[in-house]
């Protein structure tokens, strides 16, 4: 499809340098047109994980085994992370903070009295090379330097004691360990990140930009910090660090405290690697071939000249190739250069239904909206009567805890599962809880990628109730159903998303260097509020 017809037929529009670029069309990555422009990345695949999350092994909720089971259900790799130390813990003379000190130091003591050995043993138990990878890691808090997580290559890595984050980094030299700062936007001196302590290189190849705490891309925009640790400010953010000239990858993880790694919407890391092996994933992490996503597994193929994400390239002329495949309608795609929008590609306000009878679409089905506090157990199947299901992507959430609070009681993690899936149906076993407020979701969901005729039906058969809609109906808009009646749990068939609204491929050139070293990164926003960011590339 040529540029004029693509814009006319799909509702996309382009601003900045993108307006003068070469639109390759709405298509799968690696089209014939793209291959003429840029090298293929067909030998690499995006793998998804969570490298920072918590359960009741220290302070948090949910059993550790359930945490690994939950991770297996929707991730490729994980590190379930105990809290290990806080060398500069404050408040020794402040009665107001006594419970905080006791709570933390008690957990550190339990970890050293057998908890760490139990954790390492279970991490080894769940590690399956080529299927599901696990990593040993642990967290250290710091008022001065900000909180960090150590991620180890070795599955028998010891717990290393330290007197500060800088001492920790010194002791880790020569070992295969990444030390990664997180929730970076808090105030300096109060567990926000101190960029004066950043050391570029293999020990800290990436930083955690997004989690349940919020988004530290800048001091503006979506996902402000709302935790009682304080507001988000400028000096700890990613853009502040980039403006200092630092080079690092950007990633996300949940920092979840209810034993549900990968909890949908709380943060995930994507790693571009040739295989799901420890060596391949570790090397991709080391070389900054990483991306960040809030929840949806949005694929971003962004290259400058022949370089991939996280790389450093040289040259005044930069050939930019971009291919994005979302899980829902794309709101916009930004190419950011030196903190400013170089180009923006706007997706359609309303997806345009494709011509023809048989179409490829993505249909998300949500389950939840409980009236009562008790969990609703969803058991049943989603199916199609015509065409086929190409893939089933889980969007499973854990309980909405960012951190434990005084007086909270323990609870059992309810692990959601895709029991089976084939081209005609998928069997699901899920638990939804009441949305804790009108801005925090607790529903469970899956995304069906389908190829089927418009008169084919998408059918939900759960808990003795059956609802169905044709794909043609869902292309017109979403449909919802209460299970019992008003003020009861509900099912939502979201609007069917045609390929033209969640996929775009683009090529352009930037011939204007601005600095000795320019940095670029890509960010993608979907209309449902899901985000993804591709690690920056630097050009000298």
Mark where each language-model region is.
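Extended, charged catalytic domains and RNA/DNA-binding interfaces, predominantly
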Residues: 12-14, 27, 33-540
